[in-house]
Amino acid sequence: GAARAAYWTFLYELGFARIERAIEDGIRTLTGQPESDMVERVRSFFEEEARALLRPGAERAVQRHLQAGDQVALLTSSSCYLGGHFADLLGASHTLANRFEVDDRGRFTGEPVKPLCYGPGKVHYAQRLADELGADLSDCAFYTDSYADVPVLERVGHPVAVHPDPRL
């Protein structure tokens, strides 16, 4: 059969319009800053604080999928910078996250790469990866705690709500 993909995600309990605007506003504050500075700040933040936030169940779930031979991707509304660290920690081979435009001098333009990896935008990135892997989303699992991920939950064949927000 087609390869299955396990997707793990965290973050965000606010409504789509509010969080999309917040993400874009946050990215704009980076205008002109070197991407290399962000890479270093996020690495430090991950090591000092964020790494400890990973729930043990996340690692166990990912390990089960890896042992079954599944492709594992981290699908997150976080930035690719932070998401990449979590993906590496979990052993995920793909990171689907918000990306920021960088100019030819290595500085942020203040614009996100669209669509944002949030709400319906997550479906876009999940479908694109599934297509690249020759997989069908109906063969994929997706783990989330957020109501904002309902569009992805509705598209995958194996949706899993983990410590769900009350709206799930």
Model-found features: residue ranges?
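A metal-dependent, Asp-based hydrolase signature
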Residues: 1-60, 64
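C-terminal cap/substrate-recognition subdomain and adjoining C-terminal extension
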Residues: 36, 40-41, 47-168
